[in-house]
């Protein structure tokens, strides 16, 4: 069973913020397929659905971002999901808006939600889709920036990015060939 995790912070005030882009992609896939996060356990909202005949576990941690691993690891453990079947979607300050990077494995790169997942799983050997949100300008702090909502102009780009990342997930579920998905979906979304 594949496991798709979108990272974000819970609560209305965090909706459509840069830090919640992982939630937005998972929500896009769920809505497109008429699925919903119908279970809550282990500090997470999740569902198990069938896509292309395969079971897929979708998770949105109901912790704050920095504790995401406290939701992801127990749910994966409960359903016997191996880290190699995990893909985590999250915001990345080091990529410009409109950039998407798929990777087989790697460090947290300073992202506290990823640090928590790596710590709780005891490995960084899992797939991830990094979604560029750019860096703050005009002296804004990083926390203020990532917790800020996208402007209307930015949302035009980010809606394309959300759809693009959603298609990458669907392609991976369909083919199980993350190397091919990386070749097709890495880069700037036009």
UniProtKB/Swiss-Prot annotation:
Which InterPro entries has this protein been placed in?
Pept_tRNA_hydro, Pept_tRNA_hydro_CS, Pept_tRNA_hydro_sf
Q: Kindly list the residues the record flags as site (Discriminates between blocked and unblocked aminoacyl-tRNA).
A: 9
UniProt-listed GO biological process terms = protein quality control for misfolded or incompletely synthesized proteins; rescue of stalled ribosome
Instruction: Identify one Gene Ontology CC term for this UniProt entry.
Output: cytoplasm
One GO MF term on file is:
peptidyl-tRNA hydrolase activity
Compartments it resides in: Cytoplasm
Entry keywords, A to Z:
Cytoplasm, Hydrolase, RNA-binding, tRNA-binding
Please list the residues that bind tRNA.
14, 64, 66, 112
**Catalytic residues of the enzyme:** 19 (proton acceptor)
Catalytic activity of the protein: an N-acyl-L-alpha-aminoacyl-tRNA + H2O = an N-acyl-L-amino acid + a tRNA + H(+)
- Listed PROSITE patterns: PEPT_TRNA_HYDROL_1, PEPT_TRNA_HYDROL_2
- Site described as Stabilizes the basic form of H active site to accept a proton, located at 91
Does Hydrolase appear among the keywords? Answer: yes
User: EC top class, in one word?
Assistant: hydrolase
Q: What is its EC number?
A: 3.1.1.29
Coarsely, its chief localization is cytoplasm
Family statement drawn from the similarity comment of this UniProt entry = Belongs to the PTH family.
Quaternary organization: Monomer.
NCBIfam families in alphabetical order: pth
The UniProt function text for this chain reads: Hydrolyzes ribosome-free peptidyl-tRNAs (with 1 or more amino acids incorporated), which drop off the ribosome during protein synthesis, or as a result of ribosome stalling. Catalyzes the release of premature peptidyl moieties from peptidyl-tRNA molecules trapped in stalled 50S ribosomal subunits, and thus maintains levels of free tRNAs and 50S ribosomes.
**UniProt protein name:** Peptidyl-tRNA hydrolase
Name the gene for this chain: pth
